[in-house]
């Protein structure tokens, strides 16, 4: 079982409540295979991987928001292209 100390992660995020929200959001992305881990998995669960990514400064709320915005923009662009093809 992996032992993770969250003190470094708390310092990266700001407070423990935001850490919980950020780690849960990232763990959900990893669990649903919506994103690839940024650290070696080492047979760890998604929550542990998320905490390790946060601790190393690879993930935070702003980064996840930017990634989500890019995905939504890409989907919107694809939908607009499909509508343009239909209306031609």
From Swiss-Prot:
InterPro entries in alphabetical order: DNA-dir_RNA_pol_omega, Pol_omega/Rpo6/RPB6, RPB6/omega-like_sf
GO BP, sorted A to Z: DNA-templated transcription
Classification via Gene3D superfamilies: 3.90.940.10
This protein's UniProt keywords: DNA-directed RNA polymerase, Nucleotidyltransferase, Transcription, Transferase
EC number: 2.7.7.6
Reaction it catalyzes: RNA(n) + a ribonucleoside 5'-triphosphate = RNA(n+1) + diphosphate
Keyword Phosphoprotein: no
This protein's GO CC annotations: DNA-directed RNA polymerase complex
EC class: transferase
GO MF entries: DNA binding; DNA-directed RNA polymerase activity
Pfam families documented for this protein: RNA_pol_Rpb6
Family that this chain belongs to: Belongs to the RNA polymerase subunit omega family.
Subunit structure of this chain's protein: The RNAP catalytic core consists of 2 alpha, 1 beta, 1 beta' and 1 omega subunit. When a sigma factor is associated with the core the holoenzyme is formed, which can initiate transcription.
Function field: Promotes RNA polymerase assembly. Latches the N- and C-terminal regions of the beta' subunit thereby facilitating its interaction with the beta and alpha subunits.
Protein name: DNA-directed RNA polymerase subunit omega
